[in-house]
Amino acid sequence: MTTPAQAPREEVSLSPSLASPPLMALPPPQPSFPGDNATSPTREPTNGNPPETTNTPAQSSPPPETPLSSPPPEPSPPSPSLTGPPPTTIPVSPPPEPSPPPPLPTEAPPPANPVSSPPPESSPPPPPPTEAPPTTPITSPSPPTNPPPPPESPPSLPAPDPPSNPLPPPKLVPPSHSPPRHLPSPPASEIPPPPRHLPSPPASERPSTPPSDSEHPSPPPPGHPKRREQPPPPGSKRPTPSPPSPSDSKRPVHPSPPSPPEETLPPPKPSPDPLPSNSSSPPTLLPPSSVVSPPSPPRKSVSGPDNPSPNNPTPVTDNSSSSGISIAAVVGVSIGVALVLLTLIGVVVCCLKKRKKRLSTIGGGYVMPTPMESSSPRSDSALLKTQSSAPLVGNRSSNRTYLSQSEPGGFGQSRELFSYEELVIATNGFSDENLLGEGGFGRVYKGVLPDERVVAVKQLKIGGGQGDREFKAEVDTISRVHHRNLLSMVGYCISENRRLLIYDYVPNNNLYFHLHAAGTPGLDWATRVKIAAGAARGLAYLHEDCHPRIIHRDIKSSNILLENNFHALVSDFGLAKLALDCNTHITTRVMGTFGYMAPEYASSGKLTEKSDVFSFGVVLLELITGRKPVDASQPLGDESLVEWARPLLSNATETEEFTALADPKLGRNYVGVEMFRMIEAAAACIRHSATKRPRMSQIVRAFDSLAEEDLTNGMRLGESEIINSAQQSAEIRLFRRMAFGSQNYSTDSLTRNSYISKDENL
């Protein structure tokens, strides 16, 4: 019985020669599998199938070709054979002829192992495999064992090459992920080669034989110990040290059936058989094959089993070049996108800056004349005592709540933005108890903010026709105006079609109240002069020192608020423009305010700074006379204060008799000079010709002179000259000549002439 066993072993060695075609891919795997093949034949003889092996050698030669054409179909049938009679087919194919080769396999494996080790390092191994066939006959037994190793390789090769080994015949070429395909079709003979790394190339060639090879793996487990002794263990050990550690760890796992599941779920049945065989011998040889396999499989996928090693480097270079190109393309695209984004951001920033500039110039139209159609002839005098009959049209469909955005503060800061609900709470629901008064633009309510600050809330009747943006621009311009004689704005509110302005609360009411309210003690002369001077300063600031210039358009005594010390504050400046821009309809009821309107406004509809000057002249007449601008209680023809005062003003300037004009409440408790100056100022302000009216700055200087001491020291104009004018003119000419250097004059002549002039004057 022992002799027949030996015979099959020899036949196994010969079978490799017949299976030379697979050797093309075997260069890397041969070293790893000679031992495996030897072991497999030993197990096969144990099965007692030597006669069948003789028949299989012939079959083994054609199978390598068939795998190229259609490896998947052939591997699929072997799977059943593996499960059923794997040992019979395997011993039949390799062992019949190689009775002499047993010694050779032992010798050949060493060369095969060295050959296998170099191929992983360099691509040239393909030629050596062709030369190695003589030696490979010994290693050829490895191919039967190769199919078993493949099941293990998929885990290691899946990253670089595993797909290539199954792909080389037909499936590995299309995609690197072909292993799944082979796993379903063959019993894992094709797919496992990639995991085994080295066995994978031979497996690609053997795919035709895998039925028999796959069957071999099942019997090898018992025979493997013998084969390990035959192939040089040192060669097998060499591969193990290099990178086999991971593969070896996998090998122990492979002896157990888990490795096949790793390869694929379909081939677990065939895989268990190869796994035991692989665990016995290949573990040592497989590590080198694993090292070699990574380069070889990709090449097999590209060309075939013949060009596995050389093709691998090329695909690697192609991948590197393609990856470099892709990286460059990505970098270029990213740079282009970044540039596009930067340009878009720049365009947006420029647009925003331009829009801000446009908004900043919106408030510059305060000086523009108001069209005649926008108001009736009597509208100027009733700007703050008008009622809007037009429907309130809102350009917002939903309530908007605004919270305070900035603190009230210095010049250039934005006002606070209040919510409507906040103002409702502050004014106690805009109750009548908090009502301070009603003007042409709406009612004014007293309110207390959460920080206990007292404010005056003005509900504008202008509605929402202007639009939020325009209204905000106007309010922002008004809120930037700060002067000690101007009422500062605290904030505003926009809610649907509601427009509200919030001002500092002034507790001492207004000038109209103190002059004309019943039961009031009236104002003394000093207080009246103080109020007139303060209002003049505030109005002059709006006309000349404010940018953009603001025309109040509604100067009257009710818009001059008084603090507790009777410090005058001009209020409601700029609101007339808001109303006119919103096309607010002005009612015809102008009683009490009609007398402030300038005559040119009624005739031409134009408003200028001189229109405010005329209105301020009417306020001065109120302070002087204590009468209302329009008083229906006066006799017919004397209802208008301006028309009644004109003849009296001219008479007072000529005769300096002020009794007819002075307020009866004053009696004679006034300073004559100050009364005269105030009468002159009032007469100049109410002139019919707008061009002949003084500027507000001139009126301010006139009031300032009332408080200053006489700079003339009691001397009349012309009496202060103590030097001869002729002599003085001569000295001036001399200085001019000296300055321009036209002629040379000595200083002696200048001093001599000056002394002479002094002596003459004495």
Curated annotation (Swiss-Prot):
<feature type="transmembrane region" description="Helical">
    <location>
        <begin position="329"/>
        <end position="349"/>
    </location>
</feature>
<dbReference type="InterPro" id="IPR011009">
    <property type="entry name" value="Kinase-like_dom_sf"/>
</dbReference>
<comment type="function">
    <text>Could be involved in the negative regulation of root growth.</text>
</comment>
<keyword id="KW-0067">ATP-binding</keyword>
<feature type="compositionally biased region" description="Low complexity">
    <location>
        <begin position="276"/>
        <end position="305"/>
    </location>
</feature>
<keyword id="KW-1133">Transmembrane helix</keyword>
<feature type="glycosylation site" description="N-linked (GlcNAc...) asparagine">
    <location>
        <position position="319"/>
    </location>
</feature>
<dbReference type="GO" id="GO:0005886">
    <property type="term" value="C:plasma membrane"/>
</dbReference>
<keyword id="KW-0723">Serine/threonine-protein kinase</keyword>
<comment type="subunit">
    <text>Interacts with KIPK1 and KIPK2 (via its cytosolic domain).</text>
</comment>
<dbReference type="InterPro" id="IPR008271">
    <property type="entry name" value="Ser/Thr_kinase_AS"/>
</dbReference>
<keyword id="KW-0547">Nucleotide-binding</keyword>
<keyword id="KW-0472">Membrane</keyword>
<keyword id="KW-1003">Cell membrane</keyword>
<feature type="compositionally biased region" description="Pro residues">
    <location>
        <begin position="254"/>
        <end position="275"/>
    </location>
</feature>
<feature type="compositionally biased region" description="Pro residues">
    <location>
        <begin position="231"/>
        <end position="246"/>
    </location>
</feature>
<feature type="binding site">
    <location>
        <position position="458"/>
    </location>
    <ligand>
        <name>ATP</name>
    </ligand>
</feature>
<feature type="topological domain" description="Extracellular">
    <location>
        <begin position="1"/>
        <end position="328"/>
    </location>
</feature>
<dbReference type="GO" id="GO:0019901">
    <property type="term" value="F:protein kinase binding"/>
</dbReference>
<dbReference type="InterPro" id="IPR047117">
    <property type="entry name" value="PERK1-13-like"/>
</dbReference>
<keyword id="KW-0812">Transmembrane</keyword>
<keyword id="KW-0325">Glycoprotein</keyword>
<dbReference type="GO" id="GO:0106310">
    <property type="term" value="F:protein serine kinase activity"/>
</dbReference>
<keyword id="KW-0418">Kinase</keyword>
<protein>
    <recommendedName>
        <fullName>Proline-rich receptor-like protein kinase PERK10</fullName>
        <ecNumber>2.7.11.1</ecNumber>
    </recommendedName>
</protein>
<feature type="domain" description="Protein kinase">
    <location>
        <begin position="430"/>
        <end position="706"/>
    </location>
</feature>
<feature type="compositionally biased region" description="Polar residues">
    <location>
        <begin position="372"/>
        <end position="407"/>
    </location>
</feature>
<dbReference type="GO" id="GO:0005524">
    <property type="term" value="F:ATP binding"/>
</dbReference>
<feature type="compositionally biased region" description="Pro residues">
    <location>
        <begin position="60"/>
        <end position="210"/>
    </location>
</feature>
<feature type="glycosylation site" description="N-linked (GlcNAc...) asparagine">
    <location>
        <position position="278"/>
    </location>
</feature>
<feature type="topological domain" description="Cytoplasmic">
    <location>
        <begin position="350"/>
        <end position="762"/>
    </location>
</feature>
<feature type="region of interest" description="Disordered">
    <location>
        <begin position="370"/>
        <end position="410"/>
    </location>
</feature>
<keyword id="KW-0808">Transferase</keyword>
<feature type="binding site">
    <location>
        <begin position="436"/>
        <end position="444"/>
    </location>
    <ligand>
        <name>ATP</name>
    </ligand>
</feature>
<feature type="compositionally biased region" description="Low complexity">
    <location>
        <begin position="13"/>
        <end position="23"/>
    </location>
</feature>
<dbReference type="InterPro" id="IPR001245">
    <property type="entry name" value="Ser-Thr/Tyr_kinase_cat_dom"/>
</dbReference>
<feature type="active site" description="Proton acceptor">
    <location>
        <position position="554"/>
    </location>
</feature>
<dbReference type="GO" id="GO:0004674">
    <property type="term" value="F:protein serine/threonine kinase activity"/>
</dbReference>
<dbReference type="InterPro" id="IPR000719">
    <property type="entry name" value="Prot_kinase_dom"/>
</dbReference>
<dbReference type="InterPro" id="IPR017441">
    <property type="entry name" value="Protein_kinase_ATP_BS"/>
</dbReference>
<comment type="similarity">
    <text>Belongs to the protein kinase superfamily. Ser/Thr protein kinase family.</text>
</comment>
<dbReference type="Pfam" id="PF07714">
    <property type="entry name" value="PK_Tyr_Ser-Thr"/>
</dbReference>
